[in-house]
């Protein structure tokens, strides 16, 4: 996997397929490899050259000392786009990756042709706030947590029927049962970024100044970014499109990759 040193941090990335460039930004604690079992193959088949990368704090990218901010992550993504010489390009992100893309759309419109914000563009819920504090404080403990900590947290998002599906559970375990200890500087850094972001009350002002085309994708059963909150953001971003996918949780890109990819490709075909 190639890498680039941006903002003093080595960021590991990969390029898939050929066509118009599209950068995918990962969620918190999510490895770039996870795109491979969700929407990445579908976007490549649709004719995009897809760039994936591991955020700072996620191996094999560097994990500088905590804390981080979402602005740090967005600056890394912007610098990677500049390093690759692909801007302005389309960007899409899930969860924390959605926050990164939101900042890129607002602050670096010179690099962004259009942005898809998946399960993350919304006024913060009380659940998001307390969840972020819990994650940060857990990551700061001077103890070694099980390597399965991340996957056990993720599985709680899924409906009971999905947890009873051995193939689905095995897939999540293979992706998110970390090879490195759960408690590490990168994990703490990313959770610290989540705390700052979820307690930021200035989002509506940022939404109002976004000038690039934006798609917000929400999932019916998402407790982090519930549809009623996502619709508030969609109404506040000038000209934003909104798609809601039924029957999915916060992990919608893994549950219904076809529907998510269709929403993105339909939107990007117009922008």
What are these regions (language model features)?
Residues 6-62:
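Conserved HGGG/HGGXW glycine-rich cap/lid loop of the alpha/beta-hydrolase fold
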Residues 240-271:
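Catalytic active-site module of serine/aspartate enzymes centered on a nucleophile-bearing elbow/loop
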Residues 106, 114-144:
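Flexible "cap/lid" loop of the alpha/beta hydrolase fold
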Residues 148-201, 206:
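Conserved alpha/beta-hydrolase catalytic His-Asp/Glu region
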Residues 52, 56-92, 262:
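Active-site loop/oxyanion-hole signature of alpha/beta-hydrolase fold enzymes
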Residues 210, 216-218:
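Short beta-strand/loop motif that positions the catalytic acidic residue
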Residues 223-229:
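Conserved alpha/beta-hydrolase "acid-adjacent" motif
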Residues 98-109, 115:
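Short glycine-enriched nucleophile-adjacent loop
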């Amino acid at each position: 996997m190639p890498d680039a040193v941006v903002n003093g941090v080595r960021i590991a990335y990969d390029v898939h397929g050929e066509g118009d460039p599209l950068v995918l930004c990962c969620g918190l604690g999510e490895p770039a490899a996870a795109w491979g079992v969700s929407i990445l193959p579908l976007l490549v088949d649709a004719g995009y050259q897809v760039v994936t990368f591991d955020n700072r704090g996620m191996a094999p990218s560097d994990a500088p000392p905590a804390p981080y901010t979402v602005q740090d992550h967005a600056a890394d993504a912007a610098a990677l786009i500049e390093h690759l010489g692909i801007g302005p390009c389309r960007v899409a992100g899930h969860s924390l990756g959605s926050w990164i893309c939101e900042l890129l759309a607002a602050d670096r419109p010179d690099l962004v042709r259009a942005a898809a914000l998946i399960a993350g563009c919304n006024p913060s819920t009380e659940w998001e706030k307390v969840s972020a504090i819990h994650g940060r404080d857990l990551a700061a403990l001077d103890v070694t947590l099980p390597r399965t900590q991340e996957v056990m947290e993720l599985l709680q998002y899924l409906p009971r029927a999905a947890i009873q599906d051995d193939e689905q559970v095995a897939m999540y375990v293979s992706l998110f049962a970390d090879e490195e200890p759960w408690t590490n500087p990168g994990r703490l850094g990313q959770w610290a970024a989540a705390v700052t972001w979820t307690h930021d009350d200035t989002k509506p002002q940022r939404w109002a100044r976004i000038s690039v085309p934006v798609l917000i994708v929400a999932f019916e059963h998402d407790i982090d970014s519930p549809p009623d909150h996502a619709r508030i953001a969609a109404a506040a971003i000038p000209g934003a499109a909104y798609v809601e996918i039924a029957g999915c949780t916060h992990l919608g890109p893994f549950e219904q990759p076809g529907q998510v990819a269709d929403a993105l490709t339909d939107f990007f075909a117009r922008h």
